[in-house]
Curated annotation (Swiss-Prot):
CoA binds at R217, R218, G219, K220, T335, R613. Its EC number is 6.2.1.1. It comes from Methanothrix soehngenii. Mg(2+) binds at V566, H568, I571. The keyword Disulfide bond does not apply. This is Acetyl-coenzyme A synthetase. It comes from the Archaea. Belongs to the ATP-dependent AMP-binding enzyme family. ATP binds at G411, E412, P413, D435, T436, W437, W438, Q439, T440, D529, R544, R555.
Amino acid sequence: MLKLAGKEDKKLKTTVFQDETRIFNPPKELVEKSIVMQWMKKKGFKTEKEMRAWCSSDEHYLEFWDEMAKTYVDWHKPYTKVMDDSEMPYFHWFTGGEINITYNAVDRHAKGAKKDKVAYIWIPEPTDQPVQKITYGDLYKEVNKFANGLKSLGLKKGDRVSIYMPMIPQLPIAMLACAKLGVSHIVVFSGFSSKGLMDRAAHCGSRAIITVDGFYRRGKPVPLKPNADEAAGGAPSVEKIIVYKRAGVDVSMKEGRDVWWHDLVKGQSEECEPVWVDPEHRLYILYTSGTTGKPKGIEHATGGNAVGPAQTLHWVFDLKDDDVWWCTADIGWVTGHSYIVYAPLILGMTSLMYEGAADYPDFGRWWKNIQDHKVTVLYTAPTAVRMFMKQGAEWPDKYDLSSLRLLGSVGEPINPEAWMWYREHIGRGELQIMDTWWQTETGTFLNSPLPITPLKPGSCTFPLPGYDISILDEEGNEVPLGSGGNIVALKPYPSMLRAFWGDKERFMKEYWQFYWDVPGRRGVYLAGDKAQRDKDGYFFIQGRIDDVLSVAGHRIANAEVESALVAHPKIAEAAVVGKPDEVKGESIVAFVILRVGNEPSPELAKDAIAFVRKTLGPVAAPTEVHFVNDLPKTRSGKIMRRVVKARALGNPVGDISTLMNPEAVDGIPKIV
């Protein structure tokens, strides 16, 4: 269980409480049959620690990436240099090569032994609509027809296209068609407003928008095309809107600008030659939703995002040819780009893709999907786990989840008690959980267990092979075990971001400037997250660098107090903020959502405070606990502490257009 540590990092003065002593060793059979163990045996490594250190070492890490690039990707033209850092921080990977990512994801499978293998099992939200199974052969034909349609509109290598679609197969088809032509795609989450789409399309100069007439949400058709119309009105670069007919919603079509998807592909050839590009060619731009500040247009390169995500997915989740993989993210986020579209297809895997809400028509929908389609590996977010915790184990208990063999977590740190619930009720008390830490900027996992790794609840364990990740204090020194600081990448890696679209100064300032002039630290990437390593070297992510409470001289991570609150048997979710205090600087105020079947009361508030005091110590205990029905969250499910704090303190909440549930803001009580 969590023990009191109360240690303090003298440089950052961050008080660290977590000391997780529960360890879950992987089953022997999983270890012995794992992909990474086979590779270790081939290389002669005796231990996981030795292997991870070798792969990330100065002497061998480029050798490692050279092997991975040649293992996972077919190169049209071989590269002549693995990595060129002469223009730091603009790193160039696989110099001199030529590649097409759609060829690697689709063509080579469709022309080989996997032509008839299912690439996607697509489940529509309406229960009266049929499930679709799309083979690699099917995908090849549909991607090529749509790519030829895009060519007929004059789209070409270097152009940019915005994609504004729900979770339907035409979304990855559109992405793959763009990539086949060397066109950069900008996927905009379908839950964003017309302004969100307009801002992104205008900012990056999109020549076209690909969208749908409407989509289904909780059983009802929701129009989407009108948002694209409004966005195009404020984005002068947009020449065409391509509309896929999904929900049968009546929409207006502007002559000369708008074209139906089915008309565009009609009569198009099922063959389309790939456009071979430099590995540094921009594959996509993805705008962060962000918990602070304005969105950033993050540019990702083709070569690195063919190699990194495929290799990490293969090793971390140990995917075999007969697995059925389900990443529950929306493709509008980086998780969907890397782990629903590119990596699973490059590996030739079968993925499940679900259109709708997790709780429609009830909280059993996900578990029914797993039961019906024999999903073997599930990758989801702590937000979803806590939502199901709140409803109780009776929902998953109704279904046969015995096909599952591995679980994963993504999107934010998972608090230890949610981790335990996930393992106990979804994983039958025996499945390992691959808790991955990474970012939109990184393109792929940086820290994660492997199937051979002993686990600690709430820990993303160690840096993955080939990723030199560390924790530094503000002077650039590595912090000792048991301490906290800034999590950084000491070396570049293939899938990392290449730039901010149109903002070189911000790119430099945000990620590289902090340690640039520190001797020996030039080129160190500042992730913007803080973390601690326990006495065994396990990493625990504590949230963003600016998510820190200052209480009586102690710097306390918001996430740590929230984890302690959620460990309370009656609390499902929590957000904590600092309230100005004349004596202590700040006092801690908590906003909590109760699990189903519990009622707010002054006694429960006192009990929650006492629970945190016992778990973390008096300095970390909230002085107030407020019960709320909901907490404002981004579309990717992250709690917007900035908004919670602004509302609670009576300050302007700022732009909340990207919130999933803006109505939750009004439910936050003022505390001053």
